[in-house]
């Protein structure tokens, strides 16, 4: 399970180090794709396959299905972790998430989110300001 928040730097070749405690969960490889809120989603391959299978089972006649499938699947790239525990983020994904130098890697149960540090801080401030409303809405869902 992925949890926690880690700060890393993007190197000149567009690589980031995966936090050590997460590397064992990514031994079979990973998939990175465009995420929501201008971040990147990084999934272990087995979790990615589950998501892709669910998307493939949805009706393509629905506009939201097509839009979400395009975002997630067309923007995706297979990744391998090198011997130093790094992954290469493709340039088009770095541009999408505005990732330049300082990167936040956030663990979210079955995936990692990769954020530009400034974007992460802005997002956190906005979310923390609404935390009571969010908690109430989740309570209505049984969380």
Where are these regions (language model features)?
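Flexible "stalk/tail and boundary" regions
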Residues: 1-8, 12, 22-79, 83, ...
